[in-house]
Every structure is written in structure tokens, then in C-alpha cells.
Amino acid sequence: MRRAKIVCTLGPATDSYDQIKDLVDAGMDVARFNLSHGSHAEHEERYHRVRKAADETGHSVGILADLQGPKIRLGHFTEGPVLLERGDTFTITVEEGIEGDRNTCGTTYAGLATDVTPGEHILVDDGKVCLEVTDIDGPRVHTTVIEGGVISDHKGLNLPGVAVSVPALSKKDEDDLRWALRTGADVIALSFVRTGRDIQDVHRIMDEEGRRLPVIAKIEKPQAVENIEEIVAAFDAIMIARGDLGVEMPLEHVPIVQKRAIKLAKRNAKPVIVATQMLDSMIDNARPTRAEASDVANAVIDGTDAVMLSGETSVGKHAIETVHTMARIVEAAEEDILAKGLPPLTERNKPRTQSGAVARAAAEMGDFLGARFLVAFTQSGDTARRLSRYRSPIPLLAFTPDQATRSQLSLTWGVETFLGPYADSTDAMVDQVDELLLKYGRCRKGDTVVITAGSPPGVSGSTNLVRVHHIGEDDSPK
């Protein structure tokens, strides 16, 4: 059983129902809707196809709505793409209605002329083109081309080292967020997060819509790296978005940031996703490079909850095979991890709350007793996430009465979910475990399972119960 989860970005290469179903069969745990592209109508069609494929295959598949964020972009070029060569001069203006040409182009960012200073760099299209600011004349930013290349309509701009004065949510993001909440998305990702406070506007809109969902902070700005501890505390999960991060800060720092962020998220029982260019060569090729295979494996060994595919599945020529390949790499990496048994407690990973201590006790009891499964009864998902944090080699099953919680746990390492009725007592939990695990052939009579839950149910952080049970036997206290 593969433990780390796979997130797949949907797009033109995976738009049909059959293609989406094939992704689920290949190992997709979460479908990502990149709201930087496509209309609400297009994404809504994908939404229904994902739900249908999940129902027909019996797999739990979460839906992640990824907000574009306040992405800074160039404007429109009247005559198409423009080639800039080293030493050329080029002007970017914040004036409205400017059509781009060989010498000048507009931008979506009204604050550009006030935020940059001479000597700073502006990177275009993920760093493919580099411009150095030479002068600022009112709304016009004059630059010299340091590294040339082709630029075209709406290419992204990065301003490394510049604290840009943009809001956490753009008007488009707010519209997209309301659409995602009303449509039924399971998780929201917020782009270009800088501080823990950036979640506040998202929560305000969620409260207005009457639906609170987990929010993922995308770590892709140097400010986010500086504030990583408060971001992990404030948000429900993090995504290490290595594309923009590798443009905004020196490339050699990105692997260190990735490892640090994974450790911090695990310590706080928050899911973490590693994203961008994981199997990038498979957009065109049927096999990944050895370096890409090592990249995926090392993210798994570091302890990531999930690995993400972007262009590989949205526009790639080998989308389905890419997911199969990623699943095989993950499973191979996990063989060595799981063979080492339950990781020992250290000062870094020891529990710091009652719920964490109870979850650790359940994991250790399962290890000592040779349990067939660890079982978490959960309404909010918190109990399952706390158990997952300890990376026990014993398979972890989460029983929940809430479909949304089931879908949200699709991001959490090692969790396999069952949807069942609300259990209002430990005896009801035991009965449900017996019924479902025997029904699906997952256990034999007499197998040991360790059950943990929270009381009162549905309250995050209330995990306080552990019970050892032998399947099909009456071992309740007399």
C-alpha cells in the first residue's frame, strides 16, 4: 500500500471522463484545479467527472482548488511575441491601455514603478529573461536586458528581493474562491503567501459563504520562507511550490527550504506537498530522468505527505503513465522507510499536546502488539492526521461520517478512509470496524487493531481514547 499521496493537475491532456478515471486507477489521490487557467464552466465539468470517477472506482479523491494569487504579469503585445537580446533596452509601464511592442509593454501590477529601484532585477517567464532596472520615470520602469529571450502576452514577472505591495487575494481570487466553495471543492490553495495573516481574508469569505475548508499556504516567496513557522501555525497545510520559489531566491537554497518545511509541517501534524517539475521531462518523454526519480524519492524519504504533478498531467503527452511511474517511485522509496519500523521519539518529534501523546501511544501499542491496523475515528480529520505524523509502518484506517473530511484526508500520508455512520460510543466504533473490515476481507477474526478517537467527537484536538480490539470478538470491559 502506497502511503505518500499523489496530486494531479487536470488540464487539456486529462479532460475527458475516461482520462480522469484512468488517472484515479493509476493512483491519483487529489485532483488539482489550477484556477490560473480555464473558465468556471470548464472546471465545473471537470469537477463532476472527478466525482463520478471516484464513485465508480470506489476511491476517495479530493479536489484542490488552487487560486492564482496576485500574479504580476506583462500586458498584451500587439504583434505577437518579441525577442529581446542582451543589451537591449525595454520599458515596462503601469499606464493603462498600453499595447506592447519591441520597446514597451504594460503590466498588471500598478505598484511596479514605486516598488522597484535602479539596480534591481525583473525576471520574466520564470526567469527565462532577466531585466535590470536602470531608471524610473513616473509610471515607466526603464530596463536593460541582462539575459535575452522571447517574451509574449501575459508572461509572469518575478521581483526577487522586492517586498511587493499586493493584497493576499485579488478580485479574481475572491471570485474563484466563492465559486470553489459553492461548487464543492475540498481544499483551497492560496498562492504567494507571505505571512500567517494572509489566511484572514480567505476565512472571511468562507464565513460569508458558510463553508470553512482547509487552506494550503503555497511557499513560493522569500517572505514566506522567513515567516514559515507562523504560516505553518496559521494554515492547515503547506505546499512547497518550487517553481516561483526557485526564481525568487537562489536555486541552491530551495532543497534546504524544502527539507526544513517538511520537518516543520510534520512536527505540527500539518500535511505538506512538494510540487513543481517533479517528473517534468515526462511532459514529452515516456520515461523520467534518473535525477527526477531521485527527486521524487528524496521528497518521500524526507517525509512529505504528497507529491504533485503539474504540466506532466495537465498538458503532458504521457499523463497516465506519469502517474503510474510516480506511484512506483514512491512505493520503492517507502519500502526502505517502512522496513525500519516505527520511528523513535526524539526531541524534535515528541508530542506536545494531549492529543499528540494519545496518538503516539496508539502507534506504540500497535507496534508492540503487532496490530493489523491502526484505526482512527474522526469527524474533523485531526485524529488521523496526528496518527499519520508518527509514520507508523502499520496501515492507518480513518473512519468518518463526513464525506468532506474523507476527501480532505486524501492529502494525508498513509491514511485510507472509510465512510460510515456516526459512532456515538466505543462499542459502536468496534461494531463498525468488525463489520467493514470483515466485509471487505481486510481482516480475519482475531486480528488485532488499535482504535483511537476523540471525545467529544468533531472537536479538533480532542483525541483522548485508545482501545485494543480483536476483530470479531467481544473484548469490551465487563
Residue ranges and their predicted role:
Residues 1-478:
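Non-catalytic helical/linker scaffolds that mediate oligomerization, partner binding
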